[in-house]
């Protein structure tokens, strides 16, 4: 696999970019997660960043990437509505893994947004998308720009939802390379990695949560529900960060 030219790829239409990366992705599918990270660091341009929501299985990608690239900036987009357990989990993992945490937030406070727009998350898909644009997408775009990111690592997995089922290891999103080292991992592999390295699930895992985001759009799993149905009232799976 040869080095890739980000500027040249960004000039191509989306379909042509996918085709241009197809051969590389076929080779990346053969590598393990550590091999994918190492390949990206050797062949893709810096600066490098890792995003995390500090969700249920966040410790895996945080540990995996950080042990290969210590001090990599870890981007958290904080809506101000995370669970108290999530904020404690952030502190715990930041200390344990010595993370170089970079927290980004919306330019307007949560209180300002509610006063102006009401509770956007109660306003159907359109309201949820506007909420996500303000609190997730814009802060992430700002983070990528301020950190001069050209390669972005994330912990998405195909098993998590239908919208992620066909994602490749390597893509281009928001004008930068996006690498998904554990895209093909199943829940058993996640568990084994956590056990091997003395890591924990998010605290709410033990209370029946399969996925954790904001307090107002996250539901505890109940029999018959898919993981997707525990987020955004089942109307959406993605918060906007991993779309487009």
UniProtKB/Swiss-Prot annotation:
GO molecular-function terms, A-Z: phosphoadenylyl-sulfate reductase (thioredoxin) activity
InterPro entries, sorted: PAPS/APS_Rdtase, PAPS_reduct_dom, PAPS_reductase_CysH, Rossmann-like_a/b/a_fold
Catalysed reactions, semicolon-separated: [thioredoxin]-disulfide + sulfite + adenosine 3',5'-bisphosphate + 2 H(+) = [thioredoxin]-dithiol + 3'-phosphoadenylyl sulfate
Location of the protein in the cell: Cytoplasm
Any GO BP: sulfate assimilation, phosphoadenylyl sulfate reduction by phosphoadenylyl-sulfate reductase (thioredoxin)
Pathway(s) this gene product operates in, as recorded in its UniProt entry: Sulfur metabolism; hydrogen sulfide biosynthesis; sulfite from sulfate: step 3/3
UniProt-listed CDD domains: PAPS_reductase
Principal location class: cytoplasm
EC number, as in UniProt: 1.8.4.8
Domain of life: Bacteria
GO cellular component, one term: cytoplasm
Keywords: Cytoplasm, Oxidoreductase
NCBIfam families found in the cross-reference section: cysH, PAPS_reductase, PRK02090.1
Record-given protein name: Phosphoadenosine 5'-phosphosulfate reductase
Family statement drawn from the similarity comment of this UniProt entry: Belongs to the PAPS reductase family. CysH subfamily.
Location of the active site: 239
One protein family per Pfam: PAPS_reduct
Protein role: Catalyzes the formation of sulfite from phosphoadenosine 5'-phosphosulfate (PAPS) using thioredoxin as an electron donor.
């Amino acid at each position: 696999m040869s080095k890739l030219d980000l500027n040249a790829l960004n000039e191509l239409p989306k379909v042509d970019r996918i085709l241009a990366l197809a051969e590389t992705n076929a080779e990346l599918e053969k590598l393990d997660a550590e091999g994918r990270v190492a390949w990206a660091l050797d062949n893709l341009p810096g600066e490098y960043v890792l995003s995390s929501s500090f969700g249920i299985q966040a410790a895996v990608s945080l540990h995996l990437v950080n042990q290969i690239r210590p001090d990599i900036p870890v981007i958290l987009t904080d809506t101000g509505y995370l669970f108290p357990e999530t904020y404690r989990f952030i502190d715990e993992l930041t200390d344990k893994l010595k993370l170089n945490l970079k927290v980004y937030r919306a330019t307007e406070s949560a209180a300002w947004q509610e006063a102006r727009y009401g509770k956007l998350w109660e306003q159907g898909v359109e309201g949820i998308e506007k909420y996500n644009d303000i609190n997730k997408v814009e802060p992430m775009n700002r983070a990528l720009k301020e950190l001069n990111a050209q390669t972005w690592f994330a912990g998405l997995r195909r098993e998590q939802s239908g919208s992620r089922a066909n994602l490749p290891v390597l893509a281009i999103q928001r004008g930068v390379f996006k690498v998904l080292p554990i895209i093909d991992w199943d829940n058993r592999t996640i568990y084994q990695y956590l056990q091997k390295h003395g890591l924990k699930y998010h605290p709410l895992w033990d209370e029946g949560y399969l996925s954790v985001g904001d307090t107002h759009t996250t539901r505890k799993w109940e029999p018959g529900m898919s993981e997707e149905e525990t987020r955004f009232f089942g109307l959406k799976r993605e918060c906007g960060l991993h779309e487009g």
